[in-house]
Amino acid sequence: MFYQQQFDVIVVGGGHAGTEAALAAARMGSKTLLLTHNVETLGQMSCNPAIGGIGKGHLVKEIDALGGSMAKAIDKGGIQFRTLNSSKGPAVRATRAQADRSLYRSAIRDIVEHQDNLTLFQQSCDDLIVENDQVTGVVTQMGLKFRAKSVVITVGTFLGGTIHIGMENYKGGRAGDPPSIALADRLRALPFRVSRLKTGTPARLDARTLDYSVMQEQLGDSPTPVFSFMGKREDHPRQIACYITHTNSKTHDIIRGGLDRSPMYTGVIEGIGPRYCPSIEDKINRFADKDSHQIFVEPEGLNSIEVYPNGISTSLPFDVQFELVRSIKGFENAHIIRPGYAIEYDFFDPRDLKQTLETKFIKGLFFAGQINGTTGYEEAGAQGLIAGANASLQCQGKDPLILRRDEAYMGVLIDDLATMGTKEPYRMFTSRAEYRLLLREDNADIRLTAKGHELGLVDEERWQAFNIKLEAIELERQRLRDTWVHPKHAAAEALNPLLKNALSKENTLEDLIRRPEMTYETLMNVTEFGPGITDPKAAEQVEIQIKYAGYIERQQDEIAKSRKNENTLIPLDFDYSQISGLSNEVVAKLSDAKPETLGLASRISGITPAAISLLLVYLKKHGLLRKTERKTA
């Protein structure tokens, strides 16, 4: 039977991608259905209890700048906050928060349940309704049919999921949850390229059985960083410590002794695992010269006895897990509450997606999260928001939201996936962004919030707060440019001891902040020049904009040059074999990828600048040259 209400957007899956997708579509006014196999696990952290990190924190800030939920939820559920790379430049500084799983999940559910235009329904999705190569709805496990104009699939590791512990394996989406077999079969029957990936998780330990006195204590930052641009420190629950210990040569011997029963090393697991979050088996094999590896002992919550030993993900048999855990300093009497395991699952080649995350073969069908080959909550959430927004925009007949590589890490993420694909779980790093000085955590709102407000993703409260901050920055920068200090100025006596070289000529306050030894805060402490602006985030923005102005201007010049032909459209049915001078390999790659623009074509692996030049000349010669008119943020 058909459900009586028709929706604009249906989102399948209630994880990090699914919740952001459903919330985005609903915020934009689309009637949205979030279909999940269990409403109790909305926003569940299936692996490590943490949000953020290098590159990942940047994505969280961008999600937040567009009105998303992840940063708000971790501010309410974070039990330890740290700024990584705090001694380095602003481009690579990143926020990371340890999470209380229960508090984080509750925060996400609260946001979902109070979102207008969003309906929750608990059922697995077993089938898609596709008519004339366009998705028109879904069919649930009990045969109930829902109609919609767009469908977003965000099913994580559930598609054909198989859990491995030693040589034993069974079907599962994650420990304790069933897999999605029928939907996996349905998607495999469509013309998408499909393969398998693998990820894993460590055993969970009973905190009461660990000896913390022999471990290194790791405290959070004080004062604590705040993740959301709308957040405040008062949102944070009680803060607690993490701990650090290490594997040793005995641990490694135990692991080597169990490799003959490892599903990874006996060929049982075919999927490729994450390069940057390898299992402990992989670590001792790939880094055989190392006699120890670091383990972060992370609490799972304020009221939980479980800890997450980050660094010893494994799918070894339980008896080997037991021995290796107890060989570690501080874990000698550890009780394992849940065994570690690996999970193998289906993913679909993201080169079969448009930059909107809509599939190229089925109109109205969008993919987001691990189904596209990524790993990590943050990568999933970022894709979910973009997919949900574009599903809504398509329903409204509006131009899509496509973020460029120079505008957002979200743009880098999706561009990498759609143009180059991936053969292993994709993780975001700052090194993936060629314009990372412009894509800092601190300016995510300046880059994206205006666009979010225009699209309906950002509410009025956030918009007003953003404009107040922006005005404060602009007024303060003008004041600093207009205030001059002469060597004989009354404040010079207090100022000179703060400078490497005393004032010898007239300077503006902006000139003084450009000096390496001077900070905005230090200058404002000089009575004649302070107190400055009270919002620390606005003050930080003032200082960064002044100190890095030259570098930022150079990157903007580079972007202007590279963007010249970036948005030149290529006809979707274009026959590349018509172009004289293109090699068969290049013709095959371009025909296979079907890039929408010259910019996308240029980033396909193996496509040379010479090939792009030939393509551009052909398009000009045959009157096919036109720029995209779609909106990009």
UniProtKB/Swiss-Prot annotation:
Q: Does the keyword Iron apply?
A: no
Organism's domain of life? Bacteria
**In its UniProt record, which GO terms are filed under biological process?**
tRNA methylation; tRNA wobble uridine modification
PANTHER family attached here? GLUCOSE INHIBITED DIVISION PROTEIN A (PTHR11806), PROTEIN MTO1 HOMOLOG, MITOCHONDRIAL (PTHR11806:SF0)
A family per Pfam: GIDA_C_1st
Q: List the disulfide bonds.
A: none
Q: Which GO terms describe its molecular function?
A: flavin adenine dinucleotide binding
* Binding partners and assembly: Homodimer. Heterotetramer of two MnmE and two MnmG subunits.
Q: One cellular component GO annotation, for this chain's record?
A: cytosol
**Organism (species):** Pseudoalteromonas atlantica (strain T6c / ATCC BAA-1087)
Specify which residues bind NAD(+) according to the UniProt entry for this protein: 273-287
Q: Where in the cell is it found?
A: Cytoplasm
Q: What PROSITE patterns does the entry give?
A: GIDA_1, GIDA_2
Q: Which cofactor does it need?
A: FAD
Per its record, how is this protein called by name?
tRNA uridine 5-carboxymethylaminomethyl modification enzyme MnmG
State its role.
Answer: NAD-binding protein involved in the addition of a carboxymethylaminomethyl (cmnm) group at the wobble position (U34) of certain tRNAs, forming tRNA-cmnm(5)s(2)U34.
Sorted keywords for this record are:
Cytoplasm, FAD, Flavoprotein, NAD, tRNA processing
Residues that hold FAD according to the record = 13-18
Family according to the record = Belongs to the MnmG family.
Does the record's keyword annotation contain Transport? no
Which InterPro entries did the record assign?
FAD/NAD-bd_sf, GIDA_C_N, MnmG, MnmG-rel, MnmG-rel_CS, MnmG_C, MnmG_C_subdom, MnmG_C_subdom_sf
